[in-house]
UniProtKB/Swiss-Prot annotation:
Organism of origin: Yersinia pestis
Function per UniProt: Pyrophosphatase that catalyzes the hydrolysis of nucleoside triphosphates to their monophosphate derivatives, with a high preference for the non-canonical purine nucleotides XTP (xanthosine triphosphate), dITP (deoxyinosine triphosphate) and ITP. Seems to function as a house-cleaning enzyme that removes non-canonical purine nucleotides from the nucleotide pool, thus preventing their incorporation into DNA/RNA and avoiding chromosomal lesions.
Record's protein name: dITP/XTP pyrophosphatase
Keyword Cytoplasm (UniProt): no
Summary of subunit composition and partner proteins: Homodimer.
Zinc among keywords: no
Molecular function as annotated in GO: dITP diphosphatase activity; ITP diphosphatase activity; metal ion binding; nucleoside triphosphate diphosphatase activity; nucleotide binding; ribonucleoside triphosphate phosphatase activity; XTP diphosphatase activity
Record EC number: 3.6.1.66
């Protein structure tokens, strides 16, 4: 089995990808298991940050790497919080603090202007000097609710309402969410590309 480093310390992401990539003969290992520190996210886009993370992990370990960068873009806020989604309320802010800051920012915004999209960019880098990393983008449209609902998921899921399903992302089962989410879409594109390779 070919070993590949996942540029994250998030055990949930590692587990999910490890199961899906095992069929392709890939053994997914979290960068934290290999003693790799997180890369500094200095890019201005999800794509730039995902490439920075993948390159850092590949450079440090000498292994192929997969990285993701994702976040929420709210129309009424010009795309914010965007690449700053995880630290919208400050560097060490909790999911709840980020969510509350977003609700305050949108408190006077009418329903028809509360459109938003979750974005996920997945990058597969064969080696640190890979001149053509594979880049996959998933986008999930929704609306920012006025109040949180649901206990599943994380981050902004409790206020990300999906009109087509009549629920927030935090009210969906893991299977329902994976079938329609930004990360699920990007992952499907990556798996299709690996299948065709």
């Amino acid at each position: 089995m070919q070993k590949i480093v996942l540029a994250t310390g998030n055990p949930g992401k590692v587990r999910e990808l490890a199961n899906l990539l095992a069929d392709f003969g890939l053994d997914v290992v979290a960068q934290t298991e290999l003693g790799v520190e997180s890369a500094e996210e200095t890019g201005l886009t999800f794509i730039e940050n995902a490439i920075l993370k993948a390159r850092h992990a590949a450079q440090t370990t000498g292994l192929p790497a997969i990285a993701d960068d994702s976040g929420l873009a709210v129309d009424a806020l010009g795309g914010a919080p965007g690449i700053y989604s995880a630290r919208y309320a400050g560097t060490d802010a909790s999911d709840q603090e980020n969510l509350e800051k977003l609700l305050v920012a949108l408190q006077n915004v009418p329903d028809e202007k509360r459109g938003a999209q979750f974005h996920c960019v997945l990058v597969y880098m064969r080696h640190a000097e890979d001149p053509t990393p594979l880049v996959f983008h998933g986008q999930w449209p929704g609306v920012i609710a006025h109040q949180p609902a649901g206990a599943a998921g994380f981050g902004y899921d409790p206020i990300f309402y999906v009109p087509a399903l009549g629920k927030t992302a935090a009210e969906l089962t893991r299977e329902e969410k994976h079938a329609v989410s930004h990360r699920g879409q990007a992952l499907k594109l990556m798996l299709d590309a690996l299948r065709d390779a």
